[in-house]
Amino acid sequence: MATALSLAAVTACGGTGSGASDPNSVTVYSADGLGTWYETQFEAFTEQTGITVNYVEGGSGEVLSRAEKERSNPQMDVLITLPPFIQRADDQKLLAPTKDADGSTDANYVALANNYFAMIRGTGVAPAPQTWNDLLDPRFAQKLQYSTPGQAGDGTAMLLLLQHVMGEQQGLDYLGALQANNVGPPASTGKLGPKVAKGELSVANSDVQMALAAIAADKAAYEVFFPAGADGVRTTVALPYFMGQAASAPHAANAGKLIDFLMSVPVQQTLAEQVYGTSPRADVNATGPQAAAITKALDGVTIWEPDWTAVNARFDALIDAYNQATGQ
């Protein structure tokens, strides 16, 4: 969870602008990870429509929290975040029917880009950890960190994955044991990659899209891995970026135009090349070296897709149990 939200329209989209008071603008609240893609696409959207995009970035739970606090004075037009936070937003009546790629408005949010939970390890860490049990090794004391379940999408995914792989109580017990090595709650998942790259950390959590994009752009000295369970199986969680139109959007028409634009085939086709994401659209197939890197990263990994509505229904109990198990 970021300690502060940065409210700034992407420079290419016309500056910080006039926000919700400008009828020719649209305000997006988004979890971090897609910033470079947004910069390119928001600029193209502004050139095409004349609508300025004001962009607010934060942790997955933080952008939702901001929207909740602004309920009496809505500023947000579009929310983009990871599960289960988009489901929580829907449950709290913060979202309106949102058009999907087929033009249907049966749901209040749509998948914008596919993504998957991952761990990252420094390229100089030897021997490289391969299993969840390896991460309990004392050599990782104060050299391991993960984002906070209940506040970060990737951190929440890690909790759910461990309970899925090990069993509900066993997963909690594991996280309790992992506290001996854990540095503590970070500002956000996005803050962890640079720490691993610099050697301040040996291991951290991340996701495939964010990690591969950073490795390519910054030559970050870490690599993606998926720890194996006791049975030797490597498993990840499908963790899409979801997008929904705000129920009280100050610029509902502009929000609809931006959603249509981002879900269009030409824009969806840029996900892999520009930011190592893949499209949820059945009629968009990623190709090229970036798509190959995504496929290679996930080779041999079992992808688990939780019932996010069910997760949301027991969200508070899950986080309470986590806090109790880890003494937080």
Label each region the model flagged.
Residues P83-D91, S202-E223, V275-Y276:
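A ligand-binding cleft/hinge motif common to bilobed small-molecule-binding domains
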Residues G14-G17:
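Bacterial signal peptide processing site
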Residues A8-A12:
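C-terminal motif of bacterial Sec signal peptides marking the signal peptidase cleavage site
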Residues A31-N54, A214:
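Short, polar/charged alpha-helical segment
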Residues Q169-Q170, G277-Q328:
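An extracytoplasmic/periplasmic, membrane-proximal ligand-sensing/linker region
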Residues A118-V125, L160, A238-A252, T270-Q274:
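A bilobed periplasmic-binding-protein/Venus flytrap-type ligand-binding module shared by bacterial periplasmic
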Residues A246-T302:
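Mature extracytoplasmic/periplasmic domains
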Residues Y29-E39, S60-L64, E68, P74-L201, ...:
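Extracytoplasmic ligand-binding site segments that recognize negatively charged/polar headgroups
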